[in-house]
Amino acid sequence: MSSPYSTSETTSFGFRKVPIESKKALVRDVFNSVANNYDLMSFGVHRLWKASLLDWLSPHPDKVLLDVAGGTGDIASRYKRRGGGPVIVCDINQAMLEAGRSKLSEYGKLSDITWVCGDAESLPIPDRSIDAYTIAFGLRNVTSISKALKEARRVLRPGGRFMCLEFSHPAISAIIPAYNAYSFKILPEIGRLVTKDRDAYKYLVESIRKFPNQKELEKCMKSVNLEKTSYRNLSGGIATIHSAWRL
């Protein structure tokens, strides 16, 4: 199954169509710009959403976690605080990795955490070596969702769990006008004032709108043989946690 984003020649970069081969560099530039101010995307509510992700995952000291697009270190540190086992943090963006590692080092939280610069669509991780795979706010930025999901399944051991936390599509119609106003008018202006880069935040908003809705992403997961799929909407569907297993 091809990615919901792409054709054979172009793919979506926000609302723009760009050559497939250029998207990774464009996304990298965005995250180089926003690495230290990514909290603006949710006004900090992402912390509650990540707590919900970890609640559902239930960390275990014998389970190895791979956190993809995890350069901020948030999921890794939360997993360790809750008694989880070793963590591999993988991110395509070196600036995000450095920001995350620096943040965790200040609090002495680097024990048993490995940092790897790598691509979600071609992970530098052996087959069947991971107990749990998480990706928080990263799947919508890949060029091919299908390739990223296939890679997730490849690295999971049988019985391993896939979990994705991502901005999604509001399920409550009453919140949509306010959500649209914040997304398209307020957030890009905050980005301009704080980071001097309005376009980076504009892309992030557009990437959310181009991302498959909850049911569509569930179909993508099933298409690569991830099984027992389910999801939970957070904040009325502004964000969603998806869960699946390699059986």
Placement of each model-derived feature along the sequence:
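C-terminal alpha-helical "lid/dimerization" subdomain adjacent to the S-adenosyl-L-methionine
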Residues: V18, S22, L165, H169-C220, ...
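Class I SAM-dependent methyltransferase SAM/SAH-binding core
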Residues: V64-S122
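N-terminal auxiliary segments of SAM/dcSAM-dependent transferases
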Residues: M1-R28
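Core SAM-dependent methyltransferase catalytic element
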Residues: E218, V224-L247
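A short SAM/SAH-binding and catalytic strip from SAM-dependent methyltransferases
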Residues: D131-I145
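Conserved alpha-helix/loop element of class I SAM-dependent methyltransferases that forms part
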Residues: G44-K63
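A short glycine-rich, Lys/Arg-flanked "PGG" loop and its adjoining helix->strand segment in the class I
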Residues: S146-P158
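A short acidic, Gly/Pro-enriched loop at the edge of an enzyme's catalytic core
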Residues: E121-Y133
